[in-house]
Structures are given as structure tokens and as C-alpha cells.
From Swiss-Prot:
Transmembrane segments: none annotated. Belongs to the CENP-N/CHL4 family. Keywords: Centromere, Chromosome, Nucleus. One of its GO terms (cellular component) is nucleoplasm. Its main location: nucleus. This is Centromere protein N-A. Pfam families: CENP-N (PF05238). One of its GO terms (biological process) is CENP-A containing chromatin assembly.
Length: 348
């Protein structure tokens, strides 16, 4: 086994939490149960990693075996990467009812190898999702196993979740996907997150949907608190009930998908009644700025704003629409053909 391959396997093992090492190695499937029992997993982790490499050398592990281990690791710890959603559209005329995984892999490989043969390409099925791993190389260098691209495709859906895709490789990757999946177009959605499962929940509409109501506020009867003790002072109970109702109506009551960031790009022109109002109005270039919101769990944070008294209820649709529009990056511009002294935000 080449030295660089042994080093790659060792580094992959060292990235594993010590308590999960055995679980990941079993999921890998390259080493048998009896082989795993021949040594003791112990600190420091370097000792365990060296022992695993020794077993791999004895079994003549190849780069495909190492790539399979990397796939298992990244599937188990997918939240260590930032994922972007791509959406395919306009299915081709060929039948797209039944998904043939073997045919998909064959067509994908053909598309990639037609342009570049110096790549490491591997597939692994995890439940309903087909994981694709590509390590890209050049004419002069071997494929970089440490900067591989990962794509997750659910058959018979137009969505692909991709991480680690450089601009130079994007056209080839997208072309291979649409050919293998029998679509004709693909585009990047404005939706990103470290939580792969939350991205799936959003595009597959698996998250808790807000309930519909025919009333903008709760019934009057629901707003009247029961007086248990006349000496108790109820402060703003009606307002609290109204905020609670609007929050449930907007976000629902169940858990929300986990996103970490939302960005809003503003592009507008300065308006004035006359050119004497300032030099900025005479500039043809629009004014641009970016506002970003970040949180370990952004949607839950937004849902808590009104009940906490930080924001008015209902929350602005610019924030509440994120899961329903399946995007967390927005561009706010002006409507065309409006009166030169007024503006209105659109395109969100």
C-alpha cells in the first residue's frame, strides 16, 4: 500500500471520536469482526490509527477502500460540512418513472471520464440516498483525497445536495448529474446549511407546517383569563395571547429545520425631489448592502423573537418565509416602472 494512502486512512481514523471508532469501522465493512477483535482500541488515538493502517496494509487496501471509509465518515458527520442544494428541472423525454441505480452510476461515470479520467469516483447507498464522492485530479497531480466533492441524490426527486464543489469542477459535475438523472437543466438554489437533514426537510416539505386559521387573532373567549385571585395583576395578557397565536400561525408548534445563516442583499436607488437634495441622488449606481442573521438554530431564534418581546408580531415575512420559499439567501430590489420618488422591496 502506498505511503500517501496509508497516511490518508490514518488521518481519517484520527478524525473519529474515540467512542465511535468501532462503529464507523464496522459500518465501513472492510475489516472483519475477527480482525477488529485482534487489537484493543485505546488512547492515544494514534495507536489505534496505526493498528488499523497495519491491518489495511496486510489486506492490500486500495484507494477505493479508503474512499469508502471517507464516505462512511462524512455520512456519519455530515454536519461538519456546508451543504448547498441544487434543483434539476425539465425531465428529458426518456422515461423517468423507475430509478436504476446501476444505470445512474454508469452514465455518471461516463460523463465524468469523458472529460477527465484522473479522478477517484465512488458511490455508496445509505437508505434512500445515493452518496457520490469525487476526488479531482489534474494532468500533473493525483486526485486530492483530502478535498473531495460529495453529492447526495434521492432518486425520483429533482434535488441534489452538494458540498466541496469548486467552481472549476462545477460545470462537469452538473452535466454528469443531469445526464445520469435524466434531466435537462440544473441550478443552484439559494439554500445552504450544515445540517443536511434539515435541508432535506425543507425541500421535501417534511417540517411542521403552520396551522391555518380563519381568524387573525384568537376568539375573544380565549383571551379572557380566569381570575383565580382578584389580587393577582394580569399584565398585558391579551397581547401575550395574540403574540402566541400569531407565532403558532406563522411557524407552527413543532420543531423547525436547522439553519445557521440568512443573508439579505439590498439594491436600491437613492430618491429625492430635486437634485439639490444631495449628490447621492445623482449617482447612477445603486446603493448596495448586505444584512446577515446567524444563529446555531436560526429559525427557532426567529420564532422566539416576538414572544420574547424583541420584535413585533407577526414577524416580517422576509424572515418567516425562509422554510416555505426554501431559501436563506435573498436579494431585495425595486419594482420596475415605479414612480421615481418611491420604492418597494421585491424579489424575496
Amino acid at each position: 500500500m502506498d505511503e500517501w494512502l496509508a497516511e490518508f486512512i490514518k488521518r481519517t481514523i484520527l478524525k473519529l471520536p474515540f467512542s465511535e471508532t468501532v462503529t464507523i469501522l464496522k459500518a465501513w465493512g472492510f475489516l472483519t469482526e475477527s480482525e477488529l477483535q485482534t487489537f484493543t482500541f485505546r488512547y492515544p488515538k494514534d495507536v489505534t490509527a496505526t493498528e488499523v493502517v497495519r491491518l489495511c496494509e496486510a489486506k492490500n487496501a486500495t484507494v477505493d477502500h479508503a474512499a469508502a471509509l471517507d464516505l462512511v465518515f462524512n455520512h456519519a458527520y455530515s454536519n461538519k460540512k456546508s451543504w448547498t442544494v441544487y434543483q434539476m428541472s425539465k425531465p428529458s423525454e426518456s422515461e423517468n418513472d423507475l430509478f436504476d441505480a446501476s444505470e445512474f452510476k454508469l452514465q455518471f461515470k461516463k460523463s465524468i471520464h469523458a472529460v477527465s479520467k484522473n479522478v477517484t469516483l465512488n458511490f455508496k447507498q445509505f437508505g434512500e440516498a445515493l452518496w457520490i464522492r469525487i476526488a479531482w485530479g489534474t494532468h500533473n497531480t493525483r486526485p486530492n483525497q483530502y478535498k473531495a466533492t460529495f453529492a447526495v441524490y434521492h432518486s425520483q426527486t429533482p434535488y441534489v445536495f452538494i458540498t466541496g464543489l469548486g467552481k472549476a469542477c462545477r460545470p462537469l459535475m452538473c452535466q454528469a448529474l443531469v445526464i445520469a438523472a435524466k434531466y435537462s437543466q440544473i441550478q443552484e438554489m439559494e439554500l445552504k446549511s450544515r445540517c443536511l437533514e434539515s435541508l432535506k426537510d425543507i425541500v421535501f416539505k417534511r417540517f411542521n407546517q403552520p396551522f391555518s386559521s380563519h381568524h387573525s387573532i384568537p376568539h375573544e373567549k380565549a383571551l379572557i383569563p380566569k381570575i383565580v385571585d382578584p389580587r393577582v395583576i394580569y399584565e398585558n395578557m391579551r397581547e401575550k395571547d395574540r403574540v402566541s397565536h400569531l407565532t403558532r400561525e406563522t411557524f407552527g408548534e413543532g420543531p423547525l429545520p436547522k439553519l445557521e445563516l440568512a443573508s439579505y442583499k439590498l439594491e436600491t436607488m437613492f430618491r429625492a425631489e430635486s437634485i439639490m437634495d444631495g449628490n447621492l441622488t445623482a449617482v447612477n449606481e445603486p446603493f448596495r448592502c448586505v444584512v446577515k442573521f446567524s444563529s446555531p438554530h436560526l429559525l427557532e431564534a426567529i420564532r422566539s423573537l416576538a414572544p420574547a418581546g424583541i420584535a413585533e408580531a407577526p414577524i416580517s415575512t422576509l424572515l418567516s418565509c425562509i422554510p416555505h420559499k426554501a431559501r436563506n439567501s435573498f436579494k431585495i430590489t425595486e419594482k420596475r416602472g415605479m414612480h421615481p420618488t418611491s420604492s418597494q422591496t421585491t424579489n424575496f
